[in-house]
Amino acid sequence: MGNHLSDAMKILESGKLETEQGQEGRKMSWKEIPGPLQGDGQDVVSILQLVQNLMHGDDEEQGHRMQFVGEQGHMALLGHSLAAYISVLERERLRKLTTRILSDTTLWLCRLFRYENGSAYFHEDDREGLLKVCRLVMNTHYEDFTTEGFTALSSKHPVIYQSAACRPGLGQHLCSQLGLPLSCLCVVPCNTMFGSLHQMDVALLDKLVKDDRDSGKLPLLLIANAGTPGAGHTDKLSRLKELCVQYNMWLHVEGVNLATLVLGQVSSTVTAATKCDSMTLTPGPWLGLPAVPAVTLYRHEDPALSLAAGLTSSQPVEKLRALPLWLSLQYLGHDGIVERIKHASQLSQQLLEHLKTLASIKTSVEDELNSPVVVFRFSHENSAPSSGGSVEGSYAGERDILDAFNRWLGDQLAEQVPLSGVDVVELEDEGTCVRFSPLMTAAALGTQENDVAALVEKLAEMIPLLCCTLRLRQDFRDEVLQQASLSYIEDLNWPGLGVVRFEPRTTDLDEDKRQDRVEKINSDLLKKLMELDTDLNFSGGPEFSEEKNCIFIGIATEDLDVAELVETIMSLGRDIEESGKLFENMTEVVRKGIQEAELQLQKANEEKLMEEGVLRQIPLVSSVLNWFSPVQASVKGRTFNLAEGCLDSTEPVYSIKAQMRKEDSPDSPKANTRRFPGQKLFRRPGAGSDSISETSSVSQLEESFRETLHSQAADEAEVPQERPAHILEETAIADQRVPEGQEAESVETIR
């Protein structure tokens, strides 16, 4: 067993896949329907290789591989294998062994987290412990609950109280599993005037409990937080415990801040959790241990009720859940456990100290001296006002825009500094914030001090970009509104300069055709803007955005020339619109010209046939007649003049073309301006070293774009796609001619 486990870890963590031939076979077959089991079975290495292929799929990047779990993680994984192995022992020996494992683990956890005279329940789902505690409390208050069920609750309906800052869906899950109506759940609001906005309002809780008791209900249990899921704040546990004692309620505490109980110095607010009736711990993420169970510590004197509630079990196999944690705690030792929790707390303090020095960053922490969770948010309060006035109150939806900016900030920090473990959190009062909770991520990711320093460095680079983008956003809106052909799209969820749409000036089209033209123009305009040499990011917007056929402009720089940017978008849009009209008109004119040329050539062929007679149409006879009496005239080709829109004979084309070539000068100058190497577009003069050229970049773009359109128009005129094959030989488009020596061939011969 040990060899198999060692082989498994080596294969799954090595990152080395099978040979190239095996890779090709896997790409072709692993997603197909599996075949039957092999009769002689497979070896362990082959099975583990299959597991690895299913885990990684078609991912080629090493970053998607399973992270290295370390030696302590190997001990936790070994515990699951040992649990399966131990379960086949003799029943009496199994009972003694599981009792020892359970008692040892319970004793160690109670001492580590300062929870005296407690019992432990190990469970996979971190909500299951609270669910069992609720059953225990219901069995305590309702003696006939185990036999009569819900009818025993009819005399006094139970009430479960939870904070509004608890994790979403927790109370609903409890009611669903216990068979209670949602009316038995009471959500207590948080403070609104005094104290933390994420702490339960104790005075309001007292009032709610009194009202429920007066109405004949039974206050059953209170769920408090020692570290809310969002901001990491701790409720006033001492005051809540007093209320629970007063009204005979059970107090249950959960949260990430409970991990700090293992430290030598703990805040008094968290220390009060040791007096609660039960608490749920999640040592897996705190210590970086994969697949270890959560633990609920509780105090209760009646073991029969605990057994009825499912907190204890008479089955020895159930007690083996504690085995992975039993092995891991021994491997780490007391000092190793304390060191990991202490390291995570120090990372939080390090980040908090650096955030105090950054402008435009607001933090939301409960205790600046000891806060395991750091929540911060970009704010414009310290930003300089724009040219149009102060940012404060200068636009509607200010909160939504800042939320979008902070969402972008959190995503960028998580992408560029992945070892920091930051994520985006939505808080009811503060809005969208960035959260750093090393107690939940540092042990698994291996976060160190240099990762926090890199996080602060990236944050310092992004703050000026956010500030100037926020200032220029209103200026961009004003510039766009001054252009008749541009529409400003108000998208408060877009973290960038703004959203714009080019509107064609044609009004004689129906709505469907107009929408198609808007889509085509804005799509081509977006492609042209993305090809420009600029620091701005142009895109079509988020995948599920409500606004379609728009151009989304991303984060701006300090030296951005908004007027030049809008003028460039306007000029490029007009050129694309005019070129579209030119191509449409040209296609119609060419089509009519080809039809008229066909009629003229058909008429000329009929006249020629009448003049020559039928005998000249016979191959052998025509040769004899042509030798005695040569043909004097032939059908002349037709040339279509795009400039004048008329059909002419090809006879004078050659002489006119030759004269035009003589008059053309090969050295005629062309107006073609170029930017200096490294120069960026949309830079204000004097803003940086790139602003060197005196020529407007808009004129440069117009000139280069018109040259491209001219070449496209020439290609379209020379080879019209709608022309039949026989017309390609008979009709010369624009300035194409048929040489004199080839005019003797008739249309029928060419066909």
Curated annotation (Swiss-Prot):
SUPFAM superfamilies recorded: PLP-dependent transferases
Compositional bias annotation for Acidic residues: 742-751
Keyword Lyase: yes
A Gene Ontology biological process term: carboxylic acid metabolic process
EC category name: lyase
Polar residues bias: start-end ranges: 690-702
This protein's UniProt keywords: Decarboxylase, Lyase, Pyridoxal phosphate
Entry keyword annotation includes rRNA-binding: no
Gene Ontology cellular component terms for the protein in this record: intracellular membrane-bounded organelle
GO terms, molecular function: carboxy-lyase activity; pyridoxal phosphate binding
Pfam families linked: PDXDC1-like_cen, PDXDC1-like_cen2, Pyridoxal_deC
Top-level lineage group: Eukaryota
Protein name in the entry: Pyridoxal-dependent decarboxylase domain-containing protein 1
The species this protein was found in: Danio rerio (Zebrafish)
Gene expressing this chain: pdxdc1
